[in-house]
Amino acid sequence: MSTYNIVVVGAGVTGLTTALLLSKTPANKVTVIAKHMPGDYDIEYASPWAGASYMPFGKKGSDHAEWERATWPALRDLAEHQPESGIHFQDITIHNRLKDQNTATGQWSAELTSANPWFKDFVLNFQNLPRDQLPPGIDNAQRFTSVCINTAIYLPWLVSQCMKNGCVFKRAVLKHISEAAETHHSGKKANVVVNCTGLASRTLGGVADDQVYPVRGQIMIVRNDPGSMTSISGSDDGGDEVSYIFPRAAGGGTVIGGTYQKNNWDPLPDPNFANRIMQRALKLDPRLVKEGQGVEGLDIVRHGVGLRPARTDGPRIEKDQVDGVKVVHNYGHGGFGYQVSFSCAEKAVGLVNEIIQQQHDRAKL
């Protein structure tokens, strides 16, 4: 049987999901190389800092929306049948203020906070809240059953599933994407390289995509558990500040955030933002603390900053050739990488298969 050597560059949720789907074909021999691996916490490595949840942001009819629709069944299946993955079902209430519609956070969440969103027909238990249940200042709100992902469990779980299928993991730092072709664990040149380097695609040689930019998100993890997820379209603290609360599965703590700061590279938590995040979280869901308590009732595990790997024209999922190396790109997913992970990986795998088929056909001539 013919075998095909594939190198996936990047071990965030996009790279790991792509490697997992590739490794399900026995003929594919997959090596994952990355500067950062699950267990690392670094400003260059976005995936561990994610909330993470399923909250569709894509505009109706867009590729983004279709990717979110197509990924939901996989996340739902994991929550139902493989709780060891760190994914569990959780209700979420989403609040919308019309005055946020022209802010960075309001535009980011416009589809999510719509009173009639495209995803209402397939998420679980969707309902619009009656007006008499809306908090002061809220113009509309919805509730449905989503999933929350404990990234500290899920990313290592993806690694374990890849390894079960024969994937080999190696740490490496590349200056140029073409170098990846020489890093396959077989010692042979890779048939295809899959670029899942996220924000690093801005500076990686052979890619150098100037459409890639960071969107800074500051969060904190607390031990307090309000019992369900909550978010809101914006805040009065600034157009790039927002509030969300995500209790993670299996003792992962509750993520509270946050910020949506485009082109901000600051890796350090800002104490002023942190204070505002706490104040907003308590206003959004007072169940976080005991009655009568303020922010002093929040039991903080740690503060964090992540840089969402956004791209001006949206994710890049396409074939390329760089210095004679066949490359498939899969990067630029911004703050929605988890909720499009399976569908974008499936598209990338399809492109890899096209390249391999072409190579196979040429070899027979």
Question: Model features per residue range: what roles?
Answer:
Residues 1-5, 23-28, 37, 355-365:
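Eukaryotic N-terminal targeting leaders
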Residues 2-4, 36-66:
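Conserved N-terminal glycine-rich FAD pyrophosphate-binding loop of Rossmann-like flavoproteins
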Residues 7, 14-25, 32, 48, ...:
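Active-site substrate-recognition segment that forms the wall
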Residues 60-74, 141-157, 268-273, 340-341:
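Short beta-strand to alpha-helix junction loop
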Residues 73-166:
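Flavin (FAD/FMN) cofactor-binding and adjacent substrate-gating region
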Residues 130-132, 157, 291-365:
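C-terminal catalytic lobe of FAD-dependent flavoproteins
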Residues 138-192, 196, 201-203, 351:
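Helical element adjacent to the flavin cofactor pocket in flavoenzyme catalytic cores
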